[in-house]
Amino acid sequence: MLGQKLNARKREIKNRGYLNQLKRSEQVPAVIYGKGEEAVPIILEKRELNRIFNVHGSRGLFSLEIEGESKPMMTLIREIQRNPVSGQLIHLDFLSVNLNEKINSNVGVLLGGEEEVMKKGGILQAGLKEVEVLCFPQDLPEYLSADISSLEIGETLHVADLIVPAGVEILTEAESVIASILAPSKATTGEEEGAEAAGEGEEAEEKPE
């Protein structure tokens, strides 16, 4: 099956009280948007969403099985709203897609090998956390990965160094910085040395003459 299956029902657009009632009943309101199409308000079960997200994440294709519709709708999640305190899902925006048309989308960058950098005494300075790509919906990767373990202090990883799967084109400038490896700052080193000297002075004062 292409895309993770999600069950949904169409809903009427009502007042905020109705939306609050949905949330209390463990249902999540959502809207499906599409190019040249009217927005479709739907509701989904929070439990099913949490299960799918925990196992597969929220990126990639989702096949929406809408009650009363004969065919599933292929979609991507464009926005997830969560309660800032509890972290619970409160609203989703879906984008309907045509599997025969390429789409622009942002994809996260996953860095590996930071422990090796730290062993060398380097400090990771992260750059872009995501890049823009162009591909068919079914080829959209969950993330793009990069191994920084071989980088030395003073070296930089660029967008051009990312591992890109077949069928995916990166639109972000190739020279944009993904990560830089820095040396510990002299200022920090100086502060540490000063603290050590102060500690030695205190110990000297405590010793009896």
Swiss-Prot record:
One of its GO terms (biological process) is translation. Part of the 50S ribosomal subunit; part of the 5S rRNA/L5/L18/L25 subcomplex. Contacts the 5S rRNA. Binds to the 5S rRNA independently of L5 and L18. Belongs to the bacterial ribosomal protein bL25 family. CTC subfamily. This is Large ribosomal subunit protein bL25. CDD domains: Ribosomal_L25_TL5_CTC (cd00495). One of its GO terms (molecular function) is structural constituent of ribosome. It comes from Syntrophomonas wolfei subsp. wolfei (strain DSM 2245B / Goettingen). Residues 185-209 are annotated as: Disordered. Keywords: Ribonucleoprotein, Ribosomal protein, RNA-binding, rRNA-binding. Residues 190-209 have a biased composition (Acidic residues). InterPro entries: Rbsml_bL25/Gln-tRNA_synth_N, Ribosomal_bL25/Gln-tRNA_synth, Ribosomal_bL25_b-dom, Ribosomal_bL25_C, Ribosomal_bL25_long, Ribosomal_L25_dom, Ribosomal_uL5_bac-type. The keyword Kinase does not apply. Pfam families: Ribosomal_L25p (PF01386), Ribosomal_TL5_C (PF14693).
